[in-house]
């Protein structure tokens, strides 16, 4: 509340894992949950796509990842926005249709000579179809979201204009646990990118607050999602250069990654 009073033009994004903060910030906060978050799946970078769509480990995972990268590039290439990029990369935030992706997987699978070579394509298509059919994933994988732009999403989440509500509370309690870390990774990356892009504008500090931070940057590097760990570590190290502050809330500080903990004041 004090930060809101001191910096009404600032932006605060709070990741709320249990839906506990909405009542505390009724007058100053805008609440987003699975009913209205509407976070387009195509905002994911490739690493985040892999965490959602890949189901294998070891050498099979690399095979699946290579196929997924090729097919996502082809799907994004169908969007007229792709022509504006000199060289299209798999990380480019360009909308694409999931139906195009599954169709391309099917076409590429048809080029295989042996039945055993089709296994990676079948795995990927099966996982994508499973996600599309699961209503819990609709907030992110709805076909309606392909018409959104990154500017639309950032404008909504960062409350521009803030209209007296500088806090965005992102309630992720309804997000399937398998993709919670990816959702937090995308939101955190949007926070960092927003700060970098708006450097030339009037100073608008951004505070990203993560409740239960040990989930996202655990001391054990093998647990938790790697994408969310990377972006939060980067914000902790570099965020202050761009006006981004990171607030980590945890009852288990000993379980936090030491690199992030050392950056905390």
Segments predicted by a language model, with ranges:
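Transmitter module of two-component histidine kinases
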Residues: 227-247, 255-263
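Short regulatory helix/loop adjacent to the ATP-binding pocket of P-loop NTPases
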Residues: 22-28, 253-265
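Short, hydrophobic beta-strand segments that form beta-sheet elements in well-ordered domains
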Residues: 11-16, 31, 248-249
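Short loop/turn elements that form and flank the Walker-type P-loop nucleotide-binding site
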Residues: 7-9, 162-165, 201-204, 240-243, ...
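Conserved H-loop
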Residues: 16-17, 211, 244, 251-252
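P-loop NTPase motor domains
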Residues: 19-234
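Glycine- and other small-residue-rich loops at beta-strand/loop junctions that grip anionic moieties
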Residues: 172, 249-253
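Post-Walker A helix-loop "phosphate-sensing" segment adjacent to the P-loop in P-loop NTPases
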Residues: 2-13, 194
């Amino acid at each position: 509340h004090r930060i809101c009073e001191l910096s009404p033009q600032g932006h605060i994004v709070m990741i709320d894992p249990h839906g506990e903060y909405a009542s505390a910030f009724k007058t100053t906060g805008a609440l987003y949950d699975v009913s209205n978050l509407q976070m387009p799946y195509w905002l994911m970078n490739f690493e985040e796509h892999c965490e959602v769509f890949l189901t294998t480990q070891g050498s099979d995972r690399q095979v699946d990842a290579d196929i997924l990268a090729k097919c996502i590039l082809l799907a994004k290439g169908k969007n007229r926005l792709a022509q504006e990029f000199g060289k299209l990369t798999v990380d480019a935030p360009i909308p694409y249709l999931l139906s195009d992706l599954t169709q391309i997987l099917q076409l590429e699978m048809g080029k295989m000579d042996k039945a055993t070579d089709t296994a990676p394509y079948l795995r990927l298509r099966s996982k994508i179809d499973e996600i599309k059919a699961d209503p819990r994933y609709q907030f992110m994988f709805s076909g309606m979201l392909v018409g959104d732009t990154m500017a639309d999403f950032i404008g909504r989440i960062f409350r521009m204009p803030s209209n007296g509500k500088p806090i965005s509370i992102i309630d992720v309690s309804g997000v399937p646990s398998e993709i919670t870390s990816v959702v937090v990774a995308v939101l955190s990356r949007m926070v960092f990118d927003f700060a970098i892009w708006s450097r030339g504008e009037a100073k608008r500090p951004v505070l990203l607050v993560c409740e239960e931070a040990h989930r996202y940057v655990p001391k054990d590097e093998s647990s938790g999602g790697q994408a969310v760990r990377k972006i939060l570590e980067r914000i902790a190290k570099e965020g202050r250069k761009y006006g981004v502050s990171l607030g980590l809330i945890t009852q288990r500080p000993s379980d936090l990654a030491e690199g992030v903990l050392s950056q905390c004041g």
